[in-house]
A protein has these predicted regions:
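Active-site-proximal or metal-binding-adjacent scaffold patches in catalytic folds
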Residues: 1-131, 140-179
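Walker B catalytic acidic pair
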Residues: 136
Length: 179
């Protein structure tokens, strides 16, 4: 079995399946023999999850460059307008908005107030887009994921949990289609 070992300042071994590859995360001084023993112990889990990955991705057709450009164009039309609406409602300011095709995130907010959004959001209902926008704008008040942060979101967007779950349940199939 092929695998990649990533050594770092950590205390325990872990295995991750990422894009069909086996990644072993290990403390810096872990001996190769110990890693091999760990892999043998986790062999069934690894095989099961590699199979799940293959099954999930076998019929996925990657988005073309033209499709991504079109998603980006639409996102640049829709998202800034929604951000302005909710920023005023929440009472926050932001620096700039960037639309990207990120493979792992739907949105982010930097401490400088820069907002980033995934162009693939345009493939979802407007309420899903709004839930991501409100989440990122609420970071302008609290740069964390505390209970207070989520209470702030709920004040502005009471159905946040419903649409966040929708994106969690359905978003991966689109992210996996990015080249």
């Amino acid at each position: 079995m092929d695998f990649t070992v990533i050594r770092s300042k950590r205390k325990s071994l872990s295995i991750e399946i990422k894009k069909g590859e086996v990644l072993v995360r290990a403390p810096k001084r872990t001996k190769d023999k110990e890693i091999e023993k760990f892999l043998l112990l986790k062999k069934d889990w690894i095989e099961k999850h590699l199979e799940i990955y293959k099954e999930r991705n076998k019929n996925l057709i990657p988005f073309t460059d033209d499709e991504i450009k079109e998603f980006t164009r639409k996102a640049k039309e829709i998202i800034p307008e929604r951000v302005n609406f909710y920023a005023e409602k929440i009472g926050v300011i932001y620096n700039r908005i960037t639309i990207r095709h990120q493979k792992t995130r739907w949105g982010s907010c930097s401490s400088a107030g820069n907002l980033n959004f995934n162009c693939l959001l345009v493939l979802f209902p407007l309420e899903v887009i709004d839930s991501v926008i409100v989440h990122e704008l609420c970071h302008r008040k609290q740069m964390n994921h505390s209970k207070n942060f989520y209470d702030e979101i709920e004040k502005i967007f009471p159905e946040y949990k419903k649409y966040h779950k929708y994106l969690s349940d359905n978003g991966g199939q689109y992210l996996r289609r990015l080249p």
